[in-house]
């Protein structure tokens, strides 16, 4: 494995993320999308978990 190329790629990505934008516009949008995904997963698990626990209780 060529670690120098991998290190250069990681460094380049880090520089783009940290210095590419002076305001948090793009990163804020990404954060909002991730937050929305988390909320949807949480709501879906709230709906599914009681069904699964009820199914396990019936199987006993």
UniProtKB/Swiss-Prot annotation:
Record key words, sorted: Amidation, Antibiotic, Antimicrobial, Immunity, Innate immunity, Secreted, Signal
Keyword Secreted: yes
PTM annotation (Isoleucine amide): residues: 58
Record's function text: Cecropins have lytic and antibacterial activity against several Gram-positive and Gram-negative bacteria.
Signal peptide: 1-24
Family to which this protein belongs: Belongs to the cecropin family.
Record protein name field: Cecropin-B type 2
Compartment(s) where it occurs, according to its Swiss-Prot or TrEMBL record: Secreted
One GO term of the biological process aspect: defense response to Gram-negative bacterium
Entry GO terms, CC: extracellular space
Main location, first listed in the record: secreted
Source species taxonomy: Eukaryota, Metazoa, Ecdysozoa, Arthropoda, Hexapoda
Name of the gene encoding the protein in the UniProt record: CECB2
Any Pfam family: Cecropin
């Amino acid at each position: 494995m060529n670690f120098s190329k991998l290190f250069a790629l990681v460094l380049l990505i880090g520089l783009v993320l940290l210095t590419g934008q002076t305001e948090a516009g793009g990163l804020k949008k990404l954060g909002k999308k991730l937050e929305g995904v988390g909320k949807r997963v949480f709501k879906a698990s709230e709906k599914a978990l009681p069904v699964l626990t009820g199914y396990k209780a019936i199987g006993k």
